[in-house]
Amino acid sequence: LVPESIKMLVKSGFEVLIQSNAGLSSYFDDASFTDAGAQIISDSKTLYSSADVLLKVNAPSAEEIGWMKPGAILISFMFAATNPGLVDACVKQGISAFSMDAIPRISRAQKMDVLSSQANLAGYKAVIIGAAALGKIFPLLMTAAGTIKPSKVVIMGAGVAGLQAIATAKRLGAIVEVSDIRPETKEQVESLGGKFITVEGDSSIKVEGGYVKGVSEDFLKKQQEVITKHVSEADLVITTALIPGRKAPVLITEEMVQIGRAHV
């Protein structure tokens, strides 16, 4: 919650409690929340046990769920499919949990699509952090003393995070190559100035709601063979591929890292 949202909730009759220093990473100090009508609570356990509705970004721990009072509502990321223990803890405590990462990517739910908004930021920040850590500059630089070639960035996955990473890397002047197992993303990648790494198609690829639901092992092996050359020549590799409800696929193997450039 930001102070402006708190003002609306208070006006509607809600009592809003904010954990002390909760907004520091977003440049909101405690005073900005109290000015908006919220109460600052220093003790986390007291905050959790007092809430009828608890709003949180990252998934709570099982211990934190145990602090909540029975019948309370939890709204946060849960990643329930890969964190069944959290679901069990909510059931045991009598908590009604709304997993924001499970909201479908449809037009009616766009205003609640927090997964995409976070992925957008992650794609942008990944490039910025990578550029800062890289031992060379991104753009082509021509001077009287010589020419510095542009950096090459390889991005795995052309979803929300991947597309933002492409746009950011291109704006910084890098050469961008992108791999995604969904053929329909080729046009999106090229519209942002990226080069699409083509892998022969696989009729067994299943896509639902913009996400890949299944792909054969043979295709994944073929994809790794194709991208190995691109990764070995890259200055920066960013992986964004994600399968909802399952562990993110391992696309960059240790072997690829070993044959790649030392500074990748």
Q: What spans do the regions from the language model cover?
A:
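An N-terminal-biased, well-structured beta-alpha scaffold segment characteristic
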Residues: 1-89, 93
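Glycine-rich phosphate/diphosphate-binding loop of Rossmann-like nucleotide-binding domains
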Residues: 1-28, 139-230
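A structured beta-alpha segment of the ubiquitous adenosine-cofactor-binding alpha/beta core
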Residues: 37-52, 59-60, 206-237, 241-256
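Short, well-ordered beta-strand core segments
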Residues: 54, 74, 195-196, 237
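Glycine/serine-rich phosphate-binding loop and adjoining beta1-alpha1 elements at the start
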Residues: 62-152
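Conserved small/polar residues in nucleotide/adenosyl-binding loops
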Residues: 262-264
